[in-house]
């Protein structure tokens, strides 16, 4: 999988950042990015490229965010699964979590904007822990978003035990808020979103099996066929 964040992905990141208004030396960025990249596993590559981006973007997060707020307009839609640039946007979404945590008023809308490029389900998690009320209010709004990627983020980003992701101790202890989000998404028109809802319930069941059984029984009472199909996977 790490091959999806190699040299081709670095070149794509450079091109799109420059097109979005960044001002740095392509040669310098590329040299920094490729140094030791081949020795790193996937998640370490993400962290390495975040460091490189921070070195070459404005040090002020609000100024850097103005560049990232334009990057989707210049992002070629060629990140096919297994392809050489599939994970190219992952360092960009996680950059927001690493350097924008103290600016939720900028970062949360930015994650909404970026998540169609590569899911922000990992990047949203520090905001849930640090700015819980403000983030939850955004998640409720995202449940109604016209973009399925944004709606899925409201579910996948709140999974208490997301694989590869930081666990959410507050939601492991009390998943009430998560269940409320899932109530809004259980009949989502997108199977992509409904599968995330089922996976979230699976996570919750590891710590609160009775709550998930009660929730599934309640949902089955008036379930449309799509909802029934989703609940089969729990």
Regions found by a protein language model. Give the residues of each.
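Surface-facing alpha-helical segments and adjacent helix-coil boundary elements at the starts of domains
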Residues: 1-231
């Amino acid at each position: 999988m790490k091959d999806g964040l190699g040299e081709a992905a670095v070149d794509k990141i450079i091109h799109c950042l420059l097109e979005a208004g960044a001002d740095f030396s392509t040669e310098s960025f590329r040299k920094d990015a490729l140094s030791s990249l081949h020795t790193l596993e996937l998640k370490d590559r993400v962290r390495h490229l975040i460091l490189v981006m921070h070195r070459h973007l404005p040090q002020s997060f609000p100024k850097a965010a103005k560049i990232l707020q334009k990057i989707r307009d210049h992002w070629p839609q060629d990140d096919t699964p297994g392809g050489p640039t599939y994970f190219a946007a992952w360092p960009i979404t996680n950059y927001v979590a690493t350097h924008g945590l103290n600016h939720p008023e900028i970062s949360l809308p930015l994650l909404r904007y970026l998540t169609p490029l590569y899911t922000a389900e990992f990047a949203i998690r520090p905001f849930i822990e640090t700015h819980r009320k403000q983030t939850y209010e955004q998640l409720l709004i995202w449940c109604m978003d016209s973009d399925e990627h944004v709606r899925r983020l409201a579910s996948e980003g709140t999974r208490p035990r997301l694989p590869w992701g930081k666990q959410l101790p507050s939601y492991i202890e009390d998943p009430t808020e998560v269940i409320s989000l899932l109530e809004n998404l259980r009949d989502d028109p997108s199977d992509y979103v409904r599968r995330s809802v089922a996976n979230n319930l699976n996570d919750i069941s590891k710590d609160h099996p009775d709550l998930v059984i009660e929730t599934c029984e309640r949902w089955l009472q008036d379930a449309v066929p799509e909802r029934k199909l989703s609940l089969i996977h729990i």
